[in-house]
């Protein structure tokens, strides 16, 4: 009984394999293997499962299954060949060569085996040549580096060549085995920057993807020495050592699983102790006065990247708990540094922001309330421990720490603002005579006033002080920060017209001053950055954004600042935020009228929309931004380095692009200025929301533009994946619809694009929307399928048995919607022209096929009628029996009536096709001419 079931499962697996469902086929073969002990059947099942492994690129599994089949029958030629293919992909060329040699012995005339032999022979020779040349290159470089008398430039060149070798598997292994680590340590001892740098980069290459080597190198060089090298002032050196540490961490934690690097031959013990030691040393670096600002930044970067979980589905957050317990106070110390104080640690412009990001990531990585409470208590103890009426510097550090936390986990920062004396201390410091105190206090107030309740406290207790500082201070740094503080307080009500914080016209005055500073080219970039930040807050007010987009010099000054500021993340974020506000592309909660009435009845505040936030005003602002050259600025911003262009900024840029693309008439301008190309990276990387918004903007452009112009060259293939992702049923209907329009346009360009769409597995989604009740979605999906059926692999899906694809297309030809009919008839015409089998299949899928065909051939719309007549011709040409059936029906009468019409310019194609159908009937002898 079990044997019979095993045979049935084998047959089922074969059917799945023919339908290219390799996963299901593998499952069927695996189940059959458990049920049988028949050696011949076992060999066949293993051999077939190996074929599935090759198709799914599971080469290790494929080689294993083929080996089991060969164990049963050593002359199983198919199993030998499949194992050979798998071994070739795994890089085991010598073993693959032996298998194909055996195949060629068993079947000497098989050309495939002979070709494989030749190819493998060439590959093996090439591999040997590289191997021997690598050996000699390593040896030569060692000789130059060891020779004290060799010229300096030769030694430097040899060291640089070592870097290249260290990145290759063969070279790295050769260096390692030729006592290379000891030699590289000698290079580190030379204290010559260029040689030390080369040694660090070589070690970095050797550690990548190889756990055993990474462990040996970590213990040989020692973590304290690596950290001391990273602590130097030289930015290039610090970055190189950071990369070395990252390579070691990746290898020890198993993050770096690159197949070609992972051929390890040593047993490695548990790496947790080493990883913990690295983390501990990085935390110590944060508070050491010996560490440069660059070194501190790199330590923070490493902690940011490696401590918090990358996937929150993983439950183990022990690394974060360890850092919170052993290093949170050290991170808080960095956040609380005040650059103007003599006790300040060496910092760069980014150090405090990186520390804030780390605090934010650690806080987000906590799993439960007790962990968050513990985190909060450490922060509270640290801040309250700093308050000292006798020591103003310590108070400054405390307020600066709160300011830094507010830039990280805002909820936590807001709780800390509630601590006794914190807000009062901020306001008190504003009144200090010392400029440093004012600077720290004003910045802290800026960050504190994000929440409306805090902003109200500051408006009540601190606005007069801020205005006083603004009027009296001579220090530009303080003046502009005070202005931003006032801007932020003025925008605390957000877009709610009913919650304006200042008197009518006050925010416009603040904005005018910001625009004035922005246009003043004599002011340094850093100060003008604060002007943009002020506008980022104030443009929540519709009066301000309307004035701003009319001020073309200010707009262009901001765009130039954005183009020049691609190395400053704050500028990019502020510009992006300002543009989001101007285009109203932020999320707006849907207002439910019943809830509004309820809120009014219960005397709750109801948000009011500003009159200038209506659609007409937004459209006018978009037109002005496009005219001022916003697209070229956005295109420059997108090119910024990934460390500067954060995922949040990318999301903001994607929102702006989507708002700009809303009107189809503007899309040509956007494409002409490079908007299409700029959108692609935004759709591929960033937050989920950002990627969806960018993909939607891409879909809008792809739907109406010539893809060759919008996405020139190979870029067009990168557009496909974001559009396919938009077909997800979780996305809203408009996104689905415009993605289908974009894919329709792309699939009409070339077969290579159709193949790309097919490979991205868009077909099931397109078919799904062809079933949709929504008329426009169904029409768009059918039009897309009409283009896709030109691709050979799509046609094969229609040819396969056991599905209703063809039936659906035939039934859609009978729909009342002319556009759906037109698209479905086009698809059916191309399918029946491509395969005679589909002509016969069409008559079997539904009993209504003839009635539907007759309706198409009599359709009022000439394009639909023409497609119907082409289908009729394809059926007549496919098979004599089928042609006879058609002639015996009313279709002959329809063809005769259409064929007898006088062909004018519009009807020429229709009449000509009908006449070709009649000629085909005459060729069969079914009808004869009248005379």
From Swiss-Prot:
It comes from the Eukaryota. It is found in: Cytoplasm, Myofibril, Sarcomere, Z line; Cytoplasm, Myofibril, Sarcomere, A band; Cytoplasm, Perinuclear region; Cytoplasm, Cytosol. ARM repeats lie at residues 169-208, 211-250, 751-790. One of its GO terms (cellular component) is Z disc. The keyword DNA damage does not apply. It is linked to Cataract 43: An opacification of the crystalline lens of the eye that frequently results in visual impairment or blindness. Opacities vary in morphology, are often confined to a portion of the lens, and may be static or progressive. In general, the more posteriorly located and dense an opacity, the greater the impact on visual function. Myopathy, myofibrillar, 11: A form of myofibrillar myopathy, a group of chronic neuromuscular disorders characterized at ultrastructural level by disintegration of the sarcomeric Z disk and myofibrils, and replacement of the normal myofibrillar markings by small dense granules, or larger hyaline masses, or amorphous material. MFM11 is an autosomal recessive form characterized by onset of slowly progressive proximal muscle weakness in the first decade of life. More variable features may include decreased respiratory forced vital capacity, variable cardiac features, and calf hypertrophy. Interacts with HSP90 in an ATP-independent manner. Interacts with UBE4B; the interaction may target UNC45B for proteasomal degradation. This is Protein unc-45 homolog B. It comes from Homo sapiens.
């Amino acid at each position: 009984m079990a044997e019979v079931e095993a045979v049935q499962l084998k047959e089922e697996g074969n059917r799945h394999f023919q339908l290219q469902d390799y996963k299901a086929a593998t499952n069927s073969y695996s189940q059959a293997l458990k049920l049988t002990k028949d050696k011949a059947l076992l060999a066949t099942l293993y051999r077939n499962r190996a074929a599935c492994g090759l198709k799914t690129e599971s080469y290790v599994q494929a080689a294993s299954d083929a080996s089991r089949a060969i164990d049963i029958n050593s002359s199983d030629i198919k199993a030998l060949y499949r194992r050979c293919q798998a071994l070739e992909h795994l890089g085991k060329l010598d073993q693959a060569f032996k298998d194909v040699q055996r195949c060629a012995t068993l079947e000497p005339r098989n050309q495939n085996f002979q070709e494989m032999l030749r190819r493998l022979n060439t590959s093996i020779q090439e591999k040997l040549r590289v191997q021997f040349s690598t050996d000699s290159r390593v040896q030569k470089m060692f000789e130059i580096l060891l020779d004290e008398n060799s010229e300096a430039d030769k030694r430097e060149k040899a060291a640089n060549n070592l870097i290249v070798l260290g990145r290759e598997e063969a070279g790295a292994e050769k260096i390692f085995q030729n006592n290379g680590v000891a030699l590289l340590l000698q290079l580190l001892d030379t204290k010559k920057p260029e040689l030390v740098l080369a040694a660090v980069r070589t070690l970095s290459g050797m550690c990548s993807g190889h756990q055993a080597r990474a462990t040996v190198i970590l213990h040989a060089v020692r973590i304290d020495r690596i950290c001391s090298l990273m602590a130097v002032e030289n930015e290039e050196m610090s970055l190189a050592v950071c990369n070395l540490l990252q390579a070691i961490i990746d290898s020890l934690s198993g993050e770096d699983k690159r197949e070609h690097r992972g051929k390890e031959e040593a047993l490695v013990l548990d790496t947790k102790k080493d990883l913990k030691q690295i983390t501990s040393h990085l935390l110590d670096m944060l508070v050491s006065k010996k560490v440069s600002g660059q070194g501190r930044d790199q330590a923070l970067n490493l902690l940011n990247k490696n401590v918090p979980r990358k996937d929150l589905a993983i439950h183990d957050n022990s690394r974060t708990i360890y850092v919170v317990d052993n290093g949170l106070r050290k991170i808080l110390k960095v956040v609380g540094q005040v650059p103007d104080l003599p006790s300040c640690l060496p910092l760069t412009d980014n150090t405090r922001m990186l520390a804030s990001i780390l605090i934010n990531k650690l806080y987000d990585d906590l799993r439960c309330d007790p962990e968050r409470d513990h985190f909060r208590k450490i922060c509270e103890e640290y801040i309250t421990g700093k308050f000292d009426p006798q020591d103003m510097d310590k108070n400054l550090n405390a307020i600066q720490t709160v300011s830094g936390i507010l830039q990280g986990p805002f909820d936590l920062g807001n709780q800390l603002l509630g601590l006794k004396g914190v807000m009062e201390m901020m306001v008190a410091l504003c009144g200090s005579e010392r400029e440093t105190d004012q600077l720290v206090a004003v910045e802290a107030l800026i960050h504190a006033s994000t929440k409306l309740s805090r902003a109200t406290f500051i408006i009540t207790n601190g606005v007069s002080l801020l205005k006083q500082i603004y009027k009296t201070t001579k220090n530009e740094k303080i003046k502009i920060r005070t202005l931003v503080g006032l801007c932020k307080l003025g925008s605390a009500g957000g877009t709610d017209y009913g919650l304006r914080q200042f008197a009518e016209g006050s925010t416009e005055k603040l904005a005018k001053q910001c625009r004035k500073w922005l246009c003043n080219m004599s002011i340094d970039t850093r100060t003008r950055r604060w002007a943009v930040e002020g506008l980022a807050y104030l443009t929540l007010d519709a009066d301000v954004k309307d004035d701003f987009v009319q001020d073309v010099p200010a707009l262009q000054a901001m765009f130039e600042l954005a183009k020049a500021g691609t190395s400053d993340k704050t500028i990019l974020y502020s510009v992006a935020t300002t543009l989001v506000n101007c285009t109203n592309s932020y999320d707006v909660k849907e207002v439910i009228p019943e809830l509004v009435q309820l809120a009014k009845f219960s005397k709750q505040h109801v948000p009011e929309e500003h009159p200038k936030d209506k659609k007409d005003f937004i459209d006018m602002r978009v037109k002005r931004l496009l005219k001022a050259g916003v697209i070229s600025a956005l295109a420059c911003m997108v090119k910024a380095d990934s460390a500067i262009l954060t995922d949040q900024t990318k999301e903001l840029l994607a929102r702006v692009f989507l708002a700009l693309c809303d009107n189809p008439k503007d899309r040509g301008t956007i494409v002409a200025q490079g908007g299409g190309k700029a959108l692609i990276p935004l759709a591929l990387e960033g937050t989920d929301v950002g990627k969806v918004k960018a993909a939607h903007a891409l879909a809008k452009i792809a739907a109406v533009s010539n893809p060759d112009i919008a996405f020139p060259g190979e870029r067009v293939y990168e557009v496909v994946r974001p559009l396919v992702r938009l077909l997800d049923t979780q996305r809203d209907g408009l996104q689905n619809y415009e993605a289908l329009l974009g894919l329709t346009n792309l699939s009409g360009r070339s077969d290579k694009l159709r193949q790309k769409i097919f490979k991205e597995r868009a077909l099931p989604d397109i078919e799904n929307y062809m079933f949709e009740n929504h008329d426009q979605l169904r029409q768009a999906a059918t039009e897309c399928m009409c283009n896709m059926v030109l691709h050979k692999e799509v046609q094969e899906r229609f040819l396969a048995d056991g599905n209703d694809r063809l039936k659906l297309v035939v039934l859609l030809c009978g729909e009342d919607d002319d556009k759906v009919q037109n698209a479905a008839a086009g698809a059916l015409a191309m399918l029946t022209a491509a395969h005679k089998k589909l002509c016969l299949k069409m008559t079997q899928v539904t009993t209504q096929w003839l009635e539907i065909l007759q309706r198409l051939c009599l359709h009022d719309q000439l394009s639909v009628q023409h497609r119907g007549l082409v289908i009729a011709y394809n059926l007549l040409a496919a098979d004599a029996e089928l042609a006879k059936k058609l002639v015996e029906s009313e279709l002959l009468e329809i063809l005769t009536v259409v064929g007898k019409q006088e062909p004018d310019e519009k009807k020429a194609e229709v009449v000509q096709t009908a006449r070709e159908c009649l000629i085909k009937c005459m060729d069969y002898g079914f009808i004869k001419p009248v005379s």
